[in-house]
Amino acid sequence: MTQHRQTSQPRPVAKPEPNSIQLADLPLRSELVGAQPYGAPQLDVPVRLNVNENPYPPSEAVRKDMAKAVAKAAKSLNRYPDREATGLREDLARYIGFGISSSQIWPANGSNEVMTHILQAFGGPGRSMLTFTPTYSMYPEYARNTHTNYVTRPRNASWGLTTDEILSAIEEVKPDVVLLTTPNNPTGTTIPVAVIDEVCAGTDTIVVVDEAYQEFTDAPEDSSIALLPKYGRLIVVRTLSKAFALAGGRLGYAVAAPAVVDALQMVRLPYHLSDVSQVVARVALAHAPEMLARVDELRETRANLEDWLQLHGLDVVSSQSNFVLFGRFADRHAVFQALLDRGVLIREVGPTGYLRVCAGTPCQTDAFRTALLDVLPTAPRLVPEEDQ
C-alpha cells in the first residue's frame, strides 16, 4: 500500500513589532521640536479645489508621447541621468523667450527644491531672508530647513507692495535674500515689474521673484525675466505644476545670470533630477500650446468666481491667478468644514476670516457654488470690515 506523505504547511512568521520609540525621544534639532510636516489636506472627496492645481489632465496625445518618452528612458535607467539636464534647459530657454540661454536656467524637483537651493547658496546660518505676509506658507519651511533667519513685514491694505515699502523694509532688516511673490499666494495680487525694477536698482541684496502663477495673469509676458540683463542678483522662479498641469511631475526652475546658476549647482545633490522627470517635462514643453490651452478658460472661471462671490455679499481680493481669496468669516473653519461635509475641499489659509478656492472645471465650480449657497445662510457672521 502506497503511503502519501503529507506536506507540512509553513508556519506563518510573526512580523516583529516596530520599535516603540517616540518622536519626543529622538534628538531632533531644536527648531523641529513640536513642528508638524507641511502639507495641505489630501482627502478623497468629490471636489478638490484646495491646492491650486490645473483641474485638466494632459490630453491623450500628450500622455501617449510622455509614455513613449518614459519607455525610452527606462532602457537606460541603470545609468545616472544627465546631471546638467542639458536638453531640458534648452527647451525651457526656448519656451521662456526673452533671449534667455540654457546657461541661465536651473531646473529641479519643483520650485520647492529650487527655493531650497537658493537659500542654501545665499542664505544659511547667520543670514536672513525677508518676505511680505500674507504669503506662501512654505517659505518659513525653506528658511528653517536651511538655517536661514526668516523675517517678514506686512503687505499694505490692498495686499500689494510699493517700491518704498519694499526698500524701507530692506533698509530696516538688511536681509541677504528678499523674496517677492507675484502673483502672491494666497491673495492673487501682483507686484508691477516697474516696482521690481526699482527695487533691484535700490539694493545689492539677492532679489528672488516667485512667478509660479505668472501664466494665469492678464499679461503673462509682463515678467521680471525681462530685467535679468540689468541685474545680476535677480532670480526669477517658476514651475510647471500650475498652468502646465504637471503638478505630479515635480518640475520647477530658476532663471538668472549664469553665475547664479553656477552657485545653485554647488549646493545641488548629485543627479538630483531623474531621467523620467526630465523627459516628461520635455514632452510637456514640446506641447506647450496644448498644455496651456486651458489657461484662458481658467482665467475666465476665476474672474466669474470673483463676480459671483461679490454678488453674494462676500469680500473678495481681486486675483491675477487661478484662485480667489474670499471672506470674511468670523469662524472660517466652520465654513471650511461645512463645505467639506458637502464634498467640497477648499483651503483654510491666509488672513483671518478668509478662505481660498481655485478655479476648477465647470462641474467642480458649480458644486462649490451649490455647497456655499447651502452653507452661507447659517454661516458665522461676516467679520466687520473695521475689525480687519
From Swiss-Prot:
Entry keyword annotation includes GTP-binding: no
Residues found modified as N6-(pyridoxal phosphate)lysine: 242
Keywords per UniProt: Amino-acid biosynthesis, Aminotransferase, Histidine biosynthesis, Pyridoxal phosphate, Transferase
Family matches, as InterPro entries: Aminotrans_II_pyridoxalP_BS, Aminotransferase_I/II_large, HisP_aminotrans, PyrdxlP-dep_Trfase, PyrdxlP-dep_Trfase_major, PyrdxlP-dep_Trfase_small
Segments of skewed composition (Polar residues): 1-10
Family from the record: Belongs to the class-II pyridoxal-phosphate-dependent aminotransferase family. Histidinol-phosphate aminotransferase subfamily.
Protein's name in the database: Histidinol-phosphate aminotransferase
Native organism: Cutibacterium acnes (strain DSM 16379 / KPA171202) (Propionibacterium acnes)
